[in-house]
Amino acid sequence: MGQDTRSLVLVVLVGLVGAVSADVQVMKDVTLGFGQALEQCREESQLTEEKMEEFFHFWREDFKFEHRELGCALQCMSRHFNLLTDSSRMHHENTDKFIKSFPNGAVLSKTMVELIHNCELQHDAEEDHCWRILRVAECFKISCTKAGIAPSMEVMMAEFIMELKQ
């Protein structure tokens, strides 16, 4: 491989790492922004303090999607930001705008809306909105991890700590 080819490969790799890093940053910002509605939704969704704390570990590999009230909280949080239709399905346009409201959100908005939509299609038969939304969230997390856009728990915890100090 010639020097020019190696230089080109290096530039492409650095660009890809930068793009992935930017996507993860956007995902972190969207996660934190979305999470701002959690406290307001805690009572409505009958979420205990313990289960509410579980939300801070959403991006951990071993996070469990097994409590209906987590799905109810996600539904409430989505409604808080007007991200759901009357049938508790994703409102594509509003979700796109919500994601784009974050710095560099336009980089990831189309991908995120597509991932959520594909997950909704997989779980559309579930009649209970809370359970369906919980399954969609699980599918979304798996899809984000596979796509390399899921933020690490280390990054999320550092951000949570920084926000608590403010």
Curated annotation (Swiss-Prot):
Pfam families in the cross-refs: PBP_GOBP
Keyword DNA-binding: no
Disulfide-bonded cysteines: 41-76, 72-130, 119-139
Signal peptide: 1-22
Entry annotated with the keyword rRNA processing: no
Tissue expression as described in the entry: Olfactory tissue; expressed by the glia-like support cells that ensheathe the sensory neurons and line the base of the sensillum lumen.
SUPFAM superfamilies, per database record: Insect pheromone/odorant-binding proteins (SSF47565)
Superkingdom: Eukaryota
Record keywords: Disulfide bond, Olfaction, Sensory transduction, Signal, Transport
Example GO biological process: sensory perception of smell
GO molecular function annotations of the record: odorant binding
Family statement: Belongs to the PBP/GOBP family.
Function noted in UniProt: Present in the aqueous fluid surrounding olfactory sensory dendrites and are thought to aid in the capture and transport of hydrophobic odorants into and through this fluid.
Subunit structure, interactors included: Homodimer.
Protein name, per record: General odorant-binding protein 1
The species this protein was found in: Manduca sexta (Tobacco hawkmoth)
Gene: GOBP1
